[in-house]
A protein has these predicted regions:
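Short Pro/Gly-enriched beta-strand edge/turn motifs at strand-loop
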Residues: 54-66, 136-140, 281-286
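C-terminal catalytic domain of Rieske-type non-heme iron oxygenases
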Residues: 3, 85, 90, 158, ...
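Glycine-rich, flexible loop/turn motifs
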Residues: 23, 29, 101, 127, ...
Length: 418
């Protein structure tokens, strides 16, 4: 059966290069991932440790911490962590485990005062993680006990734009290094000032990678999203990638003449001509899908729950100056994305059913439409095999083939020429 030799067996050691032969080939020869990558409990467990336990994982939007004393409870590579700010407003992150006997401190987001209390024996910690209260503990006559030795175990937390990221790997590069040149590419949007306008979460019966891959490729656009294709035409899609842990595409120009959903809201101030006329669609590895338009953004944060279950946290962002947007104006944009997302959810859930069926061997990828998937798969392979590598940008010789660059070859012209 074509491609079957490239499908890793259920007993494959995913920490070795032998399991990734089809992925490591050039895009013109590469295969998609085998079904085990989406359906195997063993793969999922390894992935949580090697991908989500070592990467800069998005854990929310910065303004989720706006209330003083707000604490976010998040899963990071299967480990529960707490995210907050100290009294100076600086980001802090900790393991969600009391240093006394390991009790979980919080089970849901909440707002605390100056002290975070363990529900078991009331040990208390300030928002820097320092142990500040041990009721009746020292009075019991314990020897050589120094509270400064028993603060909460810290984790790294950084802000990128208006997004919050956490990392369990204390040796990982900074989040700015992780995303490479993407910060400069998006600098004109001034994302650090954008704010949440609406959020909701939904469970999707599909592997998190299926959700991400569906976002990254536009091969399906005409058939799954006929309405989206009116404002984001297939022939106007081009690669939007460089040095950094991200995969992306851009729609240039946006075609608002057929459907005006994206024209209702005011655009951000200070955008250059290219950003004003374009949509940027970027998958930030591993778990953020960012649709960035001149006047709003739709962000999907993926939380893997199991091999075939993903919790998708959706947030609509607006730029500074949009605080007074009318509900009826925003509703048009909201409903547009709900429609698109519903179409995507339906097809990725169908994809999961097919992968679970046991009848799939890896297919080939389209260089023009699916190269971001090849890049994504290789990022995944790097993390799974223990390679700490940040990918480079596109090679100059690849630009026409992959539909990228400042002045990409017209889509139809390229296909007709070959």
């Amino acid at each position: 059966m074509p491609g079957s030799s490239l499908s890793a067996s259920p007993a494959a050691d995913w920490t070795t290069e032998d399991a990734w032969i089809g992925t490591r080939r050039p895009i013109l020869e590469a295969h998609a991932l085998p079904a085990d990558a989406y359906a195997s409990e063993a793969f999922f467990a390894l992935e949580r440790d090697r991908v989500f336990g070592t990467s800069w994982v998005c854990i929310g939007i910065a303004d989720e911490l706006d209330p003083v004393g707000q604490v976010l409870v998040r899963d990071l590579g299967g480990r529960s962590v707490l995210i907050t700010t100290n009294t100076s407003g600086e980001l802090r992150g900790f393991a969600n485990s009391c240093r006394h006997r390991g009790t979980q401190l919080l089970d849901a987001d909440c707002t605390i005062g100056r002290t975070l209390r363990c529900p078991y024996h009331r040990w208390g910690y300030d928002r820097d993680g320092t142990l500040v209260a041990t009721p009746q503990f020292i009075d019991a006559g314990i020897d050589r006990f120094d509270p400064t030795d028993y603060g909460l175990h810290p984790i790294r937390v950084e802000q990128w734009g208006c997004l919050l990221f956490a990392n369990l790997d204390h040796d990982a590069p900074s989040v700015d290094e992780w995303f490479g040149d993407l910060g400069n590419r998006l600098a004109g949007y001034r994302l650090e000032g954008w704010h949440s306008h609406l959020s909701h979460s939904i469970d999707i019966r599909a592997n998190w990678k299926l959700v991400s891959e569906n976002f990254q490729e536009y091969y399906h656009l005409r058939w799954i999203h006929p309405e989206l294709a009116k404002v984001s035409r297939v022939e106007d899609h081009f690669r939007y990638q460089g040095n950094g842990m991200y995969c992306g595409q851009t729609t240039t120009p946006l075609s608002g003449d057929e459907r005006g959903d994206w024209d209702v809201l005011r655009p951000a101030e200070g955008l250059d001509a290219a950003d004003t006329a374009s949509g940027r669609f970027v998958a930030l590895f591993p778990n953020v899908l960012l649709s960035l338009l001149p006047n709003h953004a739709f962000v999907m944060r993926l939380e893997p729950i199991g091999p075939g279950l993903t919790r998708e946290h959706c947030t609509w962002l607006l730029p500074p100056g949009s605080e007074d947007v009318l509900d009826e104006d925003f509703a048009v944009t909201r409903d547009f994305w709900l429609e698109i997302n519903s179409e995507d959810i339906g097809i990725v859930q169908r994809g999961q059913v097919g992968l679970d069926s046991g009848g799939y061997t890896p297919g080939r990828l389209s260089p023009r439409f699916e190269e971001p998937l090849h890049r994504f798969h290789n990022m995944l392979a790097d993390r799974m095999t223990g390679i700490a590598r940040i990918p480079d940008g596109d090679l100059a010789d690849d630009l026409p083939l992959l539909g990228t660059g400042i002045n990409p070859l017209p889509w139809r012209s390229h296909l007709s020429a070959h």
